[in-house]
Structure formats: structure tokens, C-alpha cells
Amino acid sequence: MKQIVKRSHAIRIVAALGIIGLWMFFSSNELSIATPGLIKAKSGIDEVQGAAAEKNDARLKEIEKQTIMPLMGDDKVKKEVGRASWKYFHTLLARFPDEPTPEEREKLHTFIGLYAELYPCGECSYHFVKLIEKYPVQTSSRTAAAMWGCHIHNKVNEYLKKDIYDCATILEDYDCGCSDSDGKRVSLEKEAKQHG
């Protein structure tokens, strides 16, 4: 009987040690979900994300103060408006006179400035105005205007991480098939070959 008691005590001690070992294993700091270090790290990430969101909100509010048009939240509509706007923009520049008068040059300059300020997407408008400030509108000829427009479009493409457009074909690509008053088509054929 003494042996049974000793054996029973040994089993109880082993079981108790096993339970204590399992408890220690599952409640250790390295494995615990409630580990202060992990909570601190997670809260640090949340703080960084929160700060970034606040900074973005502040940036958007500042943009809204500086633009006429409101922000455009619908990305699908923003892309559709963008495609249509670029088509109009490039076609307009490709139709500009070869040798514009000072009045025509001023009108194009004014129009592009208003086009940028009144663009229906507030954030896009803000960036477009900043680009025009950095890269002023070129109005000396059709080629200068079209190449400037292509350069500006490529700056937007860079910002949006899109492919860069080959500006060498801009006048051909936006030749609307229209004719001058003398019946000649407006296209790259009318332009002298541009070197450089």
C-alpha cells in the first residue's frame, strides 16, 4: 500500500509540474497576445497611420482652400474626366496657329490658366496650377504649345506613376482631321522637322 501512495504522490507531482509548465509556457511574455511590447508596437503603428491620415486630411483641406472646385472622391469619374480633358487639351494645342498673333498667344495663356483653375477635380486642379507655375505655358507656335502640353501631361503621368508618352508624335496623335480655312489639313506635315 505504501508503494501505491508513493506512486500516487509521484503521479500528482508530475501532473502538477506538467500543469505549471504548460501554464508558464502559454503565459510567457514571448507568446502572450497581451505582451506589452507587442501592444506598444501595434499602438506605435496605429499612431503612425493615424498621423499620416491626419496629415493627408490637413493637406486636402489646404488644397480645398486654394481651389475653386471641390475634391473629387470618385476615382472612376476622376479617370473618365481626366481622359476626356487630356483629349480636349491636346487637340486644342494641336490646332493652335503655326504663327499666333500676340493676342492669340495671350488668349491661350489665359485659357490654360483658367482651365487649370476651373478643372472639376480640386486636387487635380491644385497640382495642375502648380505645374503651370513651374513650367510656364508655351505659346510661340503650334509645335511649342503641343510639346509643352505633352511635357505637362508627362509630369502628371510621373506623379501618378503612369507610362511616359512619346511627345515626338503628339501632333499626329491629336490631328483631328480638321482643315484650315484654306482647306489644308492641320497635321505634322505642315510643321517643319524639329531638331533637338
Curated annotation (Swiss-Prot):
Disulfide bridge positions per record: C121-C124, C150-C167, C176-C178
Subunit (UniProt): Homodimer. Interacts with the substrate protein PDI1, forming transient intermolecular disulfide bridges.
Membrane topology, from the record: Single-pass type III membrane protein
Cofactor requirements of the protein: FAD
Keywords linked to the UniProt accession: Disulfide bond, Endoplasmic reticulum, FAD, Flavoprotein, Membrane, Oxidoreductase, Signal-anchor, Transmembrane, Transmembrane helix
Binding site for FAD: K78, R83, W86, H127, C150, H153, N157, K162, Y174
Residue ranges of the TM segments: 13-35
Annotated gene: ERV2
Protein name: FAD-linked sulfhydryl oxidase ERV2
Topology, Lumenal side: 36-196
Xref: Pfam families: Evr1_Alr
Note: Present with 259 molecules/cell in log phase SD medium.
One BP annotation, GO: regulation of protein folding in endoplasmic reticulum
